[in-house]
Amino acid sequence: MNMPSEILLGARRWFASTSFSLAAVYDAPLKKAIGNIKKFSIGSLGLTYMISPVMLLLDAGGLSLGTRMSMVFLACTTTSLSTAIIHWAAKSYVSEATLKGNVLSLNTFNILGKKRLSQYTLDKLKIPDTNNSRPFANLESTTVPKRYFYLHPELATPIFNAIRQAQQPKQINKNDSK
């Protein structure tokens, strides 16, 4: 089998009268790392803000209050900025995706590193033009508010193929219209 083990593509036909269903499952290789980075980042942000008053109150080797205030300001600004950048870059990262029929379920991480589920029908998703797209995203919703997602292209081929197929205009068979 040429496909990676992270993707399970299966077509199931059960013995009873159940219908044929096609399912694609995507499991991101970096989901644990991204989740841990987000949790560490928000933890360090909280710790920085909790310890800031202590840094102001302690007399640290003759440093003036202005110097201590600028150190606290710099620490809080740096931690806030790094947490914001990590969240912005990783909020589109899809940790798990499941395609069942015409519905794609996507799990991403919120700012706290907890899973966030989004579900879309395939006609509400599009593969954007790479020149005009948001960085760190290769899939976007067409609904408002617009959401962006990143799936590893080499691991999510069945999902991208299904979206491309859903984007193609439907052809009307002339024999059916009579």
Swiss-Prot record:
- Gene source species: Schizosaccharomyces pombe (strain 972 / ATCC 24843)
Q: Which InterPro entries match?
A: TMEM70, TMEM70/TMEM186/TMEM223
- Name the domain of life this protein comes from: Eukaryota
Give GO terms for biological process: mitochondrial proton-transporting ATP synthase complex assembly
* Protein name from the UniProt record: Uncharacterized protein C1834.10c
Pfam families listed in its UniProt record: TMEM70 (PF06979)
PANTHER family tied to this protein: TRANSMEMBRANE PROTEIN 70, MITOCHONDRIAL (PTHR13281:SF0)
One GO cellular component assignment for this chain's record is: mitochondrial membrane
